[in-house]
C-alpha cells in the first residue's frame, strides 16, 4: 500500500487574505452603464483591467428601485470608495446608456474628490441599423 502524502498547508490557510493584491493606481477609467432598469459602475485601470465595480442591485436595491437616480448615486459611491483608498487621483469617465442614473452617478463621481480628465458619452447610436422593436401598448 502506498504511503499517504503529508499535508503541508491546508486549503483554508492558503486563501486567508484577499485574492486581489492592492496596488497603487494613480489613473483609471470609470465606466457608467445606465439602463432604465439598473446602473452599473465599473472602475478599470488604463489598460482595462477591472479594479472595482458596483451596481444598484448589489447595493441592496431591488425591482424598479434599481433604476432610480439615488440607486445610481449609491452604486457610484461604493465603486469609487474602494479605488480612492488605493490611491486613484485622476480618472476618465465613460457614460453609456439612456437611464435615469447617468447624471446622479456623475454627480457622485465629481463629489468623490477624484480629478476628471474628461467625460465622454459612449452610448451606441445606430446609423439606421436594425429595425427597432414595436412600441408598447399599455
Curated annotation (Swiss-Prot):
Residues 1-22 are annotated as: Disordered. InterPro entries: Ribosomal_uS11, Ribosomal_uS11_bac-type, Ribosomal_uS11_CS, Ribosomal_uS11_sf. Keywords: Chloroplast, Plastid, Ribonucleoprotein, Ribosomal protein, RNA-binding, rRNA-binding. One of its GO terms (biological process) is translation. One of its GO terms (cellular component) is ribosome. Residues 9-22 have a biased composition (Basic residues). It comes from Lotus japonicus (Lotus corniculatus var. japonicus). The keyword Hydrolase does not apply. This is Small ribosomal subunit protein uS11c. Part of the 30S ribosomal subunit.
Amino acid at each position: 500500500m502506498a504511503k499517504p502524502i503529508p499535508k503541508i498547508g491546508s486549503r483554508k490557510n492558503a486563501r486567508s487574505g484577499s485574492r486581489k493584491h492592492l496596488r497603487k493606481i494613480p489613473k483609471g477609467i470609470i465606466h457608467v452603464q445606465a439602463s432604465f432598469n439598473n446602473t452599473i459602475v465599473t472602475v478599470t485601470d488604463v489598460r482595462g483591467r477591472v479594479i472595482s465595480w458596483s451596481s444598484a442591485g448589489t447595493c441592496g436595491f431591488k425591482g424598479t428601485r434599481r433604476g432610480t437616480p439615488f440607486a445610481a448615486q449609491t452604486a457610484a459611491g461604493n465603486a469609487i470608495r474602494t479605488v480612492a483608498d488605493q490611491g486613484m487621483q485622476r480618472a476618465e469617465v465613460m457614460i453609456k446608456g439612456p437611464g435615469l442614473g447617468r447624471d446622479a452617478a456623475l454627480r457622485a463621481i465629481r463629489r468623490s474628490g477624484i480629478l476628471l480628465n474628461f467625460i465622454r458619452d459612449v452610448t451606441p447610436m445606430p446609423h439606421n441599423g436594425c429595425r427597432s422593436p414595436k412600441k408598447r401598448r399599455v
